[in-house]
Amino acid sequence: MSAQNYHAGLHQSSTQRPPKRPNTEHAQEPPKRALIGGQTTPSSSGGGQTPNGTNYELEVKQQLSNYQKLFDQATYPFIRDVSTYEKLNKIGQGTFGEVFKARCKNTGRMVALKKILMENEKEGFPITALREVKMLEQLKHPNITDLIEVCSAKSTGTTGSKDRATFYLVMALCAHDLAGLLSNPKIRMSLVHIKTMMKHLMSGLNKLHRSKILHRDMKAANVLISKDGILKLADFGLARPFVQRENGAGPRPLYTNRVVTLWYRPPELLLGDRQYGTKIDVWGAGCIMAEMWTRQPIMQGDTEQKQLQLISGLCGSINKDVWPNCVNMPLWSAMSSEPNSALPQGKYRILPNKMKNLMKFDAPDSKTDPFGKNVKQHDSATDDDALHLLEILLAIDPDKRPTSDEAEDDIWFFKDPVPMANVQDLMDTIPNSQFEYTVGKGAHANRGRHQNAQQRPNQQQARPSNAIPAGQYRDTIF
């Protein structure tokens, strides 16, 4: 039946039988959605060809190239060009970009420029960088790094080259990072310095968690110290908001498991947990606290299996007695299988004995040294309160670790010597920036007994790397 007869039938008496539906078996498909340039996508039976006979995959690649060209040539009227700043030297490598020391040409202010790596991005501005910008704008706190502005640099090369449009996060410049500071044997820290920096660390982490944000890459290299002695959490490239369930009700959300640099990764992540919470950051804070005394990462594994073995060797065997929920972890069976189990049994917790010999300090003289600035390490009483805090921060069972709020209010911070407002007196004794020490001399590469390094996150995979350079490292506990 033709369309003309069909429409004519609509005007006939309603008592007549309605016309049959038109036969659509061989009807022409409606036109597909147009791509840029007015051409249409192929039908499912078109064998990968567009109506004009061109290859569809090539067509899509061309359109993506057009999109990238538009992105590279775009102007951003509400952000300044990075030429406002003069780059001086490279001072670090973050999770998702390089970091440069720079000077504002207009004001002379020294800043840090964090370049957002765009070489492997095919869909414009990376979502991880958008997250970082949004969170830093939200997190205004003395112990969290400051975001000043976002700048851009126009593309200087052809589309598809590495010189495409680039963006920079302009941050307040800090004089040192904690990894570089701890790697320099000439820098001596007193108990009050350690206590002050740990107070700052817990305060910043508590602000993060109260704002419903997970850092997910706690390590000494991501802790900065300003020239006036204020410690600041930095590098939010892996951070993300989290959902806090009311009274534990409702399903627990799933997050990506491949987060946190290996040496600071807690046992639940190593066992495949994807329903983790703030306690993964608390474990990292515990690793950093121990590092204040050991001056090197305390558990240096080169694989996830070796890292679990080192945790068991230092903190005791992982089993249902110390962590009832461990057998429910996704990788429990795989990691505990013989003959090369990553979860050795019969291991005792030796962390207290290893640390108590390092945590011995004189009590400060209340008359000549009321703030404990000149407290020295030697054979006197162990700081039991510090040891207790470290013990619970590094609890195998995440439910037995304190929250960052509880850790910030731990009794250790209220015992003499109490934390100071800052560690500027320590900063005044350090002539050169420890970023230069870290980047220029390879402080991370010189940490530990075996001339290895704190691993850097894998830039292309956008997650912490498990890879340790072959031949440079052997698994070790401090």
From Swiss-Prot:
Reactions that this protein is recorded to catalyse: L-seryl-[protein] + ATP = O-phospho-L-seryl-[protein] + ADP + H(+); L-threonyl-[protein] + ATP = O-phospho-L-threonyl-[protein] + ADP + H(+); [DNA-directed RNA polymerase] + ATP = phospho-[DNA-directed RNA polymerase] + ADP + H(+)
Residues the entry annotates as binding ATP: I91, G92, Q93, G94, T95, F96, G97, E98, V99, K114
Biased composition (Low complexity): 451-464
Record's protein name: Probable cyclin-dependent kinase 9
Active site location: D217 (proton acceptor)
Organism: Caenorhabditis elegans
Keywords assigned: ATP-binding, Kinase, Nucleotide-binding, Nucleus, Serine/threonine-protein kinase, Transcription, Transcription regulation, Transferase
Function: Essential member of the cyclin-dependent kinase pair (CDK9/cyclin-T) complex, also called positive transcription elongation factor B (P-TEFb), which is proposed to facilitate the transition from abortive to production elongation by phosphorylating the CTD (C-terminal domain) of the large subunit of RNA polymerase II (RNAP II) and spt-5.
MF-aspect GO terms: ATP binding; cyclin-dependent protein serine/threonine kinase activity; protein serine kinase activity; RNA polymerase II CTD heptapeptide repeat kinase activity
Phylogenetic placement of the source organism: Eukaryota, Metazoa, Ecdysozoa, Nematoda, Chromadorea
Enzyme superclass (EC): transferase
Record-linked Pfam families: Pkinase
Annotated ranges, domain Protein kinase: 85-413
Positions with biased composition (Polar residues): 1-17
Example GO BP: nematode larval development
Region span, Disordered: 1-55, 444-478
Composition bias type Basic and acidic residues, residue spans: 22-32
